[in-house]
Amino acid sequence: MMDERAAWLTQGKGATPDLRWSFSTEAPLSALDLARETGEILAADVSGGLYLLDRQGQFLHLNRGIKDVQLVHWSDRGKLGAAIYSNNNICCFDRDLNVLWAISFSVECLAISMDSYGDYIAVSLASGKTIIIDSQKRKIASIETIRPLSYLQFQVTEPRLIGAAENGLLCCYDLEGNCLWTEKHWSNCGGIATAGDGHRIYLAGFNYGILMFDHDGETAGTLVFEGTPKVIDCDFSANRIVAATIEQELYWLNQEGKLLWGGVIPDEAIEVACDPFGQWCVCGMKSGLVQCLDWSDAI
């Protein structure tokens, strides 16, 4: 008998994925992240619950002590995590979700990211500053941009931080705070995804589709499809892209933008994440339902 939670997958177009697992948070979902190496999922809900799941969707740890979490990041090796909470605070926590330290800022925090090893954390502020901190809470660098950065990602293979503003700006910095390149564009941005080696950078460009850039920030084209992408992710090699749209649809695409599968999501997507090999993705919905969709048998 089919799991009712998988029924929406069979109504899509293309190669139907298997539902590998489902998990529900106890309150509406507020944030989600995937560790590419361990396959672990970190999720937060609006009641203050912080959940760590293994790659099979099995519950590992729970912390209820961090209230009003807006964004989370879990290092690819599963060593440490970080979160923005209560608008202008960040914290760093260990594998058991025990808080190691916290910092309060005088302005709102917009984005947070952690490098693959859990050694560095970057946080962007509404003032236009982005701060790089190490795992021991020491400030490493301070960056100022012409617009506040709403999205941050560390590159895996090089010590680089890639950031994007809500509109008109994509940039790249080294870990000493030196600007490597800046690229202006003409679209609002709803999310960012990067290949592991940085050779491809994607921006969810809303009505403009998915904007593509290369390792040096040069425009590399646009992927246009039905719907208005708002959150996206890609695998390590950028061969697979997962995108959720404002119209409440989910798309699984190849690197050329060809639709491999698409369907209507039961609820608004808060975040999507793709495994490093492009075989499965995780979709976190506002209701608190988190599902892993698996195409490995279709490859």
Language-model segments: residues:
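Hydrophobic core register within WD40 beta-propeller blades
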Residues: 32, 72, 112-114, 152, ...
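Beta-strand-rich domains and repeat architectures in extracellular enzymes and scaffolds
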Residues: 21-48
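Residue-level detector of Asp-centered blade-edge/turn motifs that repeat once per structural unit
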Residues: 36-38, 76-77, 116-117, 156-158, ...
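A short beta-strand motif characteristic of beta-propeller blades
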Residues: 18-23, 58-63, 98-103, 138-144, ...
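Hydrophobic beta-strand positions that form the internal "hydrophobic ladder"
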Residues: 41, 80-81, 121, 161, ...
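A short helix->beta-strand "capping" segment at the edge of beta-propeller domains
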Residues: 2-28, 56
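WD40 beta-propeller blade core
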Residues: 51, 90-91, 131, 171-172, ...
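Blade-level signature of beta-propeller repeat domains, shared across WD40, Kelch, NHL, RCC1
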Residues: 267-299
